Regions:
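ATP/NTP phosphate-donor binding region
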Residues: 1-118
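A glycine/threonine-rich phosphate-anchoring loop and its flanking beta-alpha core
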Residues: 16-18, 132-225
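Short glycine/serine/threonine-rich phosphate/pyrophosphate-binding segments
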Residues: 126-132
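Conserved, helical-rich catalytic subdomain that frames metal- and/or nucleotide-binding sites
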Residues: 228-248, 253-256
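Conserved phosphate/pyrophosphate-binding and hydrolysis machinery centered on Walker-type P-loop NTPases
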Residues: 259-262
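Acidic, metal-coordinating catalytic segment for phosphate/diphosphate chemistry
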Residues: 267
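Conserved small/polar residues in nucleotide/adenosyl-binding loops
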Residues: 275-277
Length: 277
C-alpha cells in the first residue's frame, strides 16, 4: 500500500546555490515507514540511518531487516535486506562525531552502493546532520531524504541543508551545505518525545513566531493548552508555518550570511518564555 501526503510544499533554492529544491511532505496518523519505503519493488540501493531511541518507535520497519527486538539492538549495528541497508547508531549529541559519520559512509561502502543510491535519516537533528554530511561525501554526493522525529527537527534542523558533526571539543565544526531531496513529516512522532525535548523544540517555534509570523504568535497565545497537550492538528499547523518560514529564509540566505543567522538564536529563552506565560 502506497501512502499519500496530506499536504506538501517546495523549498526552492537560489539559482547560484547548486541545488534545485526540497519537497516537504506532511502525513497524518501514526508513522508508516513501511508504506513509504517498503510497499513497492525497489531497485535502488538505499541506506536507512536511525538510532537506538528511534528504532523502538518503528518496530514494523526494523523487523523488515532483523528479528532482533528493536529495544535491545546495540549501536552501531548494520543489517541488510535486498538492496537496502539499515544502520543503527547511538542516540544523542555525544554521538555526533566524525567517527559515526564515517560509520554511515562505511555502511554504504560495504554494501557496494553506487552513486545512484539514496541515504535516509530517520531521527532528530543529530541524525539528519550526520547523514546529510555522509551523503555529501559519499561518491562526491548522493541523494538524501529526512524523516524528522522531533519538534526541533520538524521546524528547523532538517530544513535548509546545514549538515555536519562535532569535532574534538568544537560543535558543528565540520560539515557542508547539502539539502535533502525530500523531507517526510509525521507529527505523531512528537507524541513520544520526552517533555524536555518537546519544550526545546518549542523554543524554535516561539522564535519563529516572534521573527516571522503573527499568525503563529496568535496560535501560541490562544491555544496554549492544545500546544502543551500536543494536539495533532495544532502541531501540524505549527510545523507547517515554521517550515514555510524557515524555507523562505533559506531561499533568501542559503549560506547563512544575513537574516538566516538570526535563526541560530532562541533555543534558550524561547522555551522558558513560553512555558511560563
Amino acid at each position: 500500500m502506497n501512502i499519500s501526503p496530506i499536504d506538501n510544499f517546495e523549498l526552492l533554492f537560489p539559482d547560484n546555490s547548486g541545488f534545485d529544491k526540497t519537497d516537504i511532505l506532511f502525513y497524518s496518523g501514526k508513522n508508516d515507514l513501511c508504506s513509504l519505503y517498503l510497499s513497492a519493488e525497489n531497485k535502488r540501493n538505499r541506506l536507512f540511518v536511525t538510532d537506538t531511541n528511534i528504532a523502538p518507535l518503528c518496530t514494523d520497519f526494523i523487523s523488515h531487516f532483523t528479528d532482533e527486538n528493536a529495544d535491545n539492538i546495540k549501536a552501531p549495528s548494520i543489517f541488510k535486506k535486498g538492496n537496502d541497508t539499515l544502520c543503527i547508531l547511538g542516540a544523542g549529541e555525544k554521538y555526533k562525531t566524525i567517527e559515526n559519520v564515517l560509520e554511515i559512509v562505511r555502511a554504504a561502502l560495504n554494501s557496494n552502493f553506487n552513486r545512484n543510491c539514496l541515504f535516509v535519516a530517520i531521527g532528530g537533528g543529530v541524525l539528519s546532520d550526520m547523514t546529510g554530511f555522509a551523503a555529501s561525501m559519499f561518491k562526491r554526493g548522493v541523494d538524501v531524504e529526512f524523516v524528522p522525529t522531533t519538534l526541533l527537527s520538524d521546524v528547523d534542523a532538517s530544513i535548509g541543508g546545514k549538515t555536519g558533526c562535532d569535532f574534538d571539543s568544537y560543535k558543528n565544526m565540520i560539515g557542508a551545505f547539502y539539502p535533502a531531496k525530500k523531507i517526510h513529516i509525521w507529527s505523531s512522532f512528537i507524541q513520544s518525545l520526552p517533555q524536555n525535548e518537546f519544550i526545546s523544540g518549542l523554543g524554535e517555534v516561539v522564535k519563529t513566531a516572534f521573527l516571522f509570523s503573527p499568525e503563529l504568535t496568535e496560535i501560541l497565545k490562544t491555544q496554549k493548552e492544545k500546544v502543551m497537550s500536543r494536539n495533532e492538528e495544532v502541531l501540524k499547523k505549527i510545523i507547517t508555518i515554521c517550515a514555510k518560514a524557515k524555507a523562505k529564509t533559506v531561499h533568501e540566505d542559503f549560506k547563512e550570511k544575513g537574516i538566516r543567522a538570526y535563526l541560530n538564536y532562541g533555543h534558550t529563552f524561547g522555551p522558558v518564555s513560553y512555558t511560563h506565560l
